């Protein structure tokens, strides 16, 4: 009897040891689905909206979620490559990098004001005397982030195509920051995303700081635009479970049609819906990069 008891104790101990440090099933409290957002807007707003979205996804799917907002677009891509992030809300070019480097899988394309695409814009102070793309020659430009499609890649490619050389440029850290760099006189030109006017209000990056700087629409104006770019994505890391992926996609599409969902998504990245996406939808961006002889690897920073 004593031998049986000792044997049982040993089995329990071995079982306990083998379970130490082992993660639970994905989507549980001990191993939540990790959803990362890029810092293209003010971090505090992204966190607030991201948490609201995660809370609703938990109700709709039964899975547990955890959000994070790293300090750069590239950090989100690398986290997905290392399986530290399961879902990334990735801008267009960042998605292409994630697909190229780590075979990430697109799930959804965002919709803004009924459109699945957007443009990059060049903005200047209204009284600067800069009226066209050619006038940017020799000026200082505030781009957003090295991996931002509308805030750097497309604008810099357009300048290169037209042989226009700025005196210098720097990365402001986000779309609102690039707008403020122009507004506050730290740059002659700022680059960011642009979407059409909706209900009489411009829907570009200036809107993100309109509450704090109510005269920015009059003081800062767009003078040129890039070609159209497919919208941002909701992307899943390689080998993310297919059923969970479909559950999250369906939940996000359902949530986007509710009043609470519309508010959170609008506050997050000015999103008002989603459409199912395929990797081929983004070939137009790859073709543009190829035509301009730009390597994706240049922008993984």
Regions found by a protein language model. Give the residues of each.
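Bacterial signal peptide processing site
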Residues: 21-23
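Pocket-lining segment of extracytoplasmic ligand-binding domains
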Residues: 128, 140-243
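An extracytoplasmic/periplasmic, membrane-proximal ligand-sensing/linker region
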Residues: 30-59, 240-301
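Beta->alpha turn/N-cap motifs
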Residues: 39, 69-73, 83-102, 110, ...
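Flexible hinge/capping segments at coil-to-helix
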Residues: 30, 124-141
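Extracytoplasmic small-molecule ligand-binding "clamshell" domains
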Residues: 26-93
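Hydrophobic/proline-rich hinge and linker segments of small-molecule sensing/allosteric domains
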Residues: 108-132, 235-236
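C-terminal motif of bacterial Sec signal peptides marking the signal peptidase cleavage site
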Residues: 15-19
